[in-house]
Amino acid sequence: MEKLLNTPMPSFDKETPGSPFWTKLAFFLCRRTAANQFRTIEYSGMENIPTDRGSLCAAWHTNGLIDPLGIMLAHPKEFVMGGRHDLVTRPILSFWTRRLAVQPVVRKAELLRGGCSEEEATNLNGRSLLTLATGIASGFGCVLFPEGTSHDLSHMMRFRTGPMRTVLAAAAIAKGSGRKCPVMQPVGLHFRVRHHYRTDMWVEFGEPHYLPEDDIPQDLIEAVQKREWVEPPGDLVRSLRDLSLIHI
């Protein structure tokens, strides 16, 4: 838990939330990896990405670390990143995630296996989601997967609410600071044969969902301005989750 709490925090007053040098190097290597892994890569709906505000990209999750790779390489924004907690504790991988300021999240599945208390997980997750929300409100991009885990099923798994709660908190931060409200951006990820080397990938950016700014409660706005995590209203979270189910 101490290692998770000591995860480097992103900075939103420069070009990249993480280290500029390591971020540029990581994305260079990712582009070479994508060019080697895929025979063709196609993007559509780029005109649907608003460039005057932050956005949270949400997609189904069938191809592990390849899924965020396809989204981030095409998106015009720099990204603030979050993911399951072991991304920042595993050897080799943690070297990169810590330099990119990836924020760890402890899922319920990991909590049941032990390693930390529910209170510690709640505090860590609240800090991470609030940090991601601050980055989105500051105009950066972010990608989170509502299913919560990568899988090889032919249908979507039950959606978690973390991405919806995060983007609503980002909207509260933006509204309280006079910035433009961020959007939730549905993304379609398509692979000709998902597990094949040199297959084809198609990334489809759907029309963004503009959040209901007038429905964001004042107590949520005041809490996030104090850097305190408060859960957004359940009805707003569920309506946004149901809307995402239709479009992802």
Label each region the model flagged.
Residues S239-L243:
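A conserved active-site cap/scaffold subdomain adjacent to cofactor or substrate pockets
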Residues V230-G234:
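N-terminal assembly/attachment segments of tailed bacteriophage virion structural proteins
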Residues M1-P20, K24:
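Eukaryotic N-terminal low-complexity, Ser/Thr- and Lys/Arg-rich leader segments
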Residues I246-I248:
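Conserved small/polar residues in nucleotide/adenosyl-binding loops
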Residues T16-P217, A223, D235:
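Soluble catalytic domains of membrane acyltransferases
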